[in-house]
């Protein structure tokens, strides 16, 4: 490690920066030479032993912290986990699970996945992996996942407890590639109006959205609500492909510009397949990066309108620079700009990450989430859309065409605490585990469930009682009534998710989402 650091730094920078024609200044007083000497001196001369790997990692993080808020360093393990969520697959056994009473409860096996193929079903409890008990031993979720995952083709032996069967069951599961979907929901929210919710922009997102659009068109969709609320972004190429489907060939989607990265434009490569029909894009303060690229392009090209609240404002182009050990630097090299010229990135000061991290809190305190008039926009931030020349504003993030305030009264403090303490989800999972077959038998059709099912009030009362044990109590009768009302809806959505899928969850929950309902009103009434 002693002399290796200097070599690695030079070789790494020489390779990764060649395309930008950057020059590394070497010599007795060069920054790189100084950094290498410092590390070697500490490793060899410091009074106590040091972890050289941690020393170098901390030095890298220290340098990046002086830059913009999003340049970052991740370890090999962190990099792998981050990439898996976007790359479309990972190797494993293919189950969605949750921990209940210190045991692993299977929520759903992945369709055609390794576990479903050998007969594992929803409601099974996995109690041992390769003869190692995982139930009743206080094992972390991360440790359990490590035991369940493994290279494709390898075998894992599972011991399962199934409701109604006295003896434990044994399954021999061959690990395989497990798809990671990024689309949360797709359904007809009203006659003629389709709804798609995308959670992130991953490798498979364009295909997922394409399949959903084709399916919804067959069901009579003429207009679309494209929900990007809470979408934290993902791959630029995926965002460009999806935006392309709504635009005409040659339309500008986004461009980038930076000190060492000259302007690069991303345009629609062909006429999109979904250019007709009204389009409403939904955003909120947690919509970021690729979600802002798509919503900004749709708005600037006058293809549709944006409904909701101002987006996060993350518009930095980052280049991944990977080390041989799998760790990675993600270095900001440019900014994203919408077709009208708005910079998506909100303002920041180099090195002041704490202030930047408090931005959403400050926006909330200043009333931006609840009152549109609290957002003060100067004429210098004024831009115009490309076709209808409507006024839109820059300054960071995408400002919606139709503002929807955050309802701060809907979820009471009591409700938030019951959810945060996992009291709601734990009771929900136990209830579903006990009544799964009964519910499946009674509600073979989701439409019937949506229209007629009501959560037993005894379940709500059990949650309230457990909350009381944790000193979670209502301020008054009004708060208790409000808490019970939305607990019932939340529990119905959770039951729908675990009996069917996330799409059914959102079909229940969206009827209480003000931004979604505003979009429905806009498409049905025109105002």
Residue ranges and their predicted role:
Residues 1-28:
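Bacterial Sec-dependent N-terminal signal peptides
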Residues 20-31, 35-52, 75, 105-108, ...:
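Cleft-lining beta-strand/loop regions that shape enzyme active-site pockets
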Residues 46-107, 153-185, 509-520, 527:
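Extended, small/polar residue-biased N-terminal targeting/export presequences
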Residues 123-125:
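Structural motif
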Residues 127-128, 254, 305, 330, ...:
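Hydrophobic beta-strand signal
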Residues 129-130, 161, 347, 395:
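Residue-level recognition of conserved beta-strand edge/terminus positions
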Residues 305-337, 350-364, 370-377:
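Flexible, acidic/glycine-enriched loop-and-adjacent beta/alpha segments
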Residues 343-344, 348-527:
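Conserved functional hotspot residues or short segments at active or partner-binding sites
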């Amino acid at each position: 490690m002693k002399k290796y650091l200097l070599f690695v730094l030079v070789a790494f920078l020489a390779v990764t920066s060649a395309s930008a024609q950057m020059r590394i200044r070497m010599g007795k007083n060069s920054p790189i030479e100084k950094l290498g000497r410092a590390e070697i001196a500490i490793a060899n001369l410091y009074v106590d032993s040091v972890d050289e790997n941690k020393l170098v990692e901390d030095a890298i993080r220290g340098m990046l912290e002086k830059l913009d808020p999003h340049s970052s360093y991740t370890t090999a393990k962190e990099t792998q986990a981050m990439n898996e969520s976007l790359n479309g697959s990972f190797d494993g056994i293919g189950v969605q699970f949750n921990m209940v009473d210190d045991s692993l409860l299977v929520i759903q096996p992945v369709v055609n996945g390794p576990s479903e193929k050998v007969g594992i079903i929803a409601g099974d409890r996995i109690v041992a992996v390769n003869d190692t008990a995982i139930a009743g031993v206080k094992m972390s979720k991360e440790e359990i996942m490590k035991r369940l995952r493994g290279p494709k083709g390898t075998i894992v032996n599972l011991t399962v407890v199934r409701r109604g069967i006295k003896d434990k069951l044994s399954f021999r599961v061959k690990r395989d590639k497990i798809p990671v979907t990024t689309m949360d929901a797709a359904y007809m929210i009203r006659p003629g109006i389709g709804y798609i919710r995308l959670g992130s922009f991953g490798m498979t997102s364009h295909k997922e959205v394409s399949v959903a659009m084709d399916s919804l068109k067959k069901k009579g969709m003429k207009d679309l609500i494209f929900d990007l609320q809470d979408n934290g972004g993902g791959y630029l190429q995926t965002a460009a492909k999806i935006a392309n489907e709504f635009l005409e060939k040659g339309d500008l989607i986004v461009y980038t510009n930076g000190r060492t990265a000259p302007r690069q434009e991303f345009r629609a490569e062909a006429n999109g397949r979904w250019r007709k029909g009204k389009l409403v894009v939904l955003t909120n303060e947690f919509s970021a990066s690729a979600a802002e690229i798509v919503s900004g392009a749709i708005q600037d090209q006058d293809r549709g309108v944006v409904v909701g609240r101002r987006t996060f404002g993350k518009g930095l182009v980052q280049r991944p620079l990977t080390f041989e050990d799998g760790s990675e630097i993600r270095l900001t090299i440019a900014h994203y700009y919408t077709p009208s010229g708005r910079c998506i990135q909100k303002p920041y000061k180099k090195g002041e990450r704490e202030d930047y991290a408090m931005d959403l809190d400050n926006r909330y305190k200043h009333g931006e989430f609840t009152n549109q008039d609290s957002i003060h926009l100067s004429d210098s931030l004024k831009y115009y859309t490309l076709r209808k020349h409507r006024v839109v504003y820059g300054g960071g993030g995408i400002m919606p065409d139709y503002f929807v305030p955050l309802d701060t009264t809907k979820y009471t403090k009591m409700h938030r605490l019951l959810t945060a303490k996992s009291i709601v989800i734990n009771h929900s999972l136990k209830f579903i585990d006990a009544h799964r077959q009964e519910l499946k038998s009674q509600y073979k059709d989701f439409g019937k469930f949506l229209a007629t099912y009501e959560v037993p009030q005894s379940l709500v009362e059990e949650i309230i009682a457990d909350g009381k044990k944790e000193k979670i109590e209502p301020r008054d009768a009004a708060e208790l009534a409000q808490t019970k009302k939305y607990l019932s809806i939340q529990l119905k959505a959770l039951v729908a998710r675990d009996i069917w899928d996330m799409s059914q969850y959102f079909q229940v929950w969206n009827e209480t989402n003000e931004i979604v309902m505003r979009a429905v009103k806009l498409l049905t009434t025109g105002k």
